[in-house]
A protein has these predicted regions:
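Catalytic His-Asp segment of secreted/periplasmic serine-dependent ester chemistry enzymes
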Residues: 1, 168-241
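Conserved SGNH/GDSL esterase-like catalytic core that processes O-acyl groups on lipids
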Residues: 60-144, 164-167, 171-174
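Alpha/beta-hydrolase-fold catalytic nucleophile elbow
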Residues: 129, 158-159
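A short helix->loop->beta-strand "cap" motif at the edges of active sites that frequently abuts
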Residues: 151-155
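Extracytosolic low-complexity repeat regions of secreted or lipid-anchored proteins
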Residues: 159-160, 176
């Protein structure tokens, strides 16, 4: 019968794998290392995705447990700055539910908001952490958020901060903030968490950054996250007195 020499088979296979192994090692050695900023966004994004099922379950329980009443708690609809701060928001307010995404603006945030309203999953306090990704029709969109807010809820607007244009009164981010301040004066259920003001007062968290996303290394990322969460929590505490 046919005799198979195992050595004759394994030796060619072994040598055929050498180029593949070398290529893999080269890729590993030359792949760019991600910085603190990218790593933080990646980790927070993964954590948020991991908690989606838990959030959905909690929301469903809240709806069934309060047929006609508004469920207690806080829903955050935010952008990449809120995503960056999500870890500290959850530390400051463990029951908070954060839905934040990179590049989200007022327009795309409104779609998320409307979906949450349709699904009856908005919690009592709704935090809109949007505006850094500017839009021309910010007034119209903010008005829609207010008009569509279901009865029994309150709205907290986190003012946007862009350090590159922070002192330019004609910039869209600054104008968006100004309009949010006006809305808070007009409606007794609308409040402002002035992240812009906090950011101005803490230049130490902006060294080495793009002046939109706080922190260039672990210490300043942590400091920025704590300040962001503190700004939001203080406003919510005042609103719920």
């Amino acid at each position: 019968g046919l005799k198979i020499n195992i050595k004759q088979i394994t030796i060619p296979v072994f040598y055929s794998l050498i180029p593949f192994t070398l290529i893999t090692l080269i890729i590993m050695m030359t792949a760019p290392k991600i910085g603190a900023f990218e790593e933080n966004l990646l980790v927070n994004g993964l954590n948020q995705a991991d908690s989606k099922m838990q959030i959905t379950r909690t929301q469903a329980d809240n709806v069934s447990a309060s047929q006609y009443n508004v469920a207690k708690g806080t829903t955050v609809i935010g952008d990449s700055v809120a995503l960056r701060a999500s870890e500290w928001l959850k530390q400051a307010m463990p029951e908070i539910q954060v839905d934040a995404a990179v590049s989200r603006n007022l327009e795309s945030g409104l779609q998320v908001y409307q979906t949450d309203i349709s699904n009856k999953v908005l919690l009592e306090t709704v935090v809109l952490a949007l505006g850094t990704n500017t839009v021309d029709n910010y007034e119209s969109l903010l008005n829609q958020f207010i008009e569509k807010l279901p009865k029994g809820h309150r709205l907290v607007l986190v003012t946007p901060y862009d350090g590159r244009t922070a002192h330019n009164a004609s910039s869209l981010a600054v104008k968006t903030r100004q309009y949010e301040l006006e809305l808070a004066k007009k409606y007794d259920y609308v409040f402002v968490a002035d992240w812009y003001q906090t950011a101005i007062e803490h230049p130490e968290i902006w060294y080495g950054t793009d002046y939109v996303h706080f922190g260039s290394e672990t210490t300043t990322i942590t400091k920025g996250g704590e300040l962001y969460a503190q700004t939001v929590k203080q406003t919510i505490d005042e609103a719920t007195k």
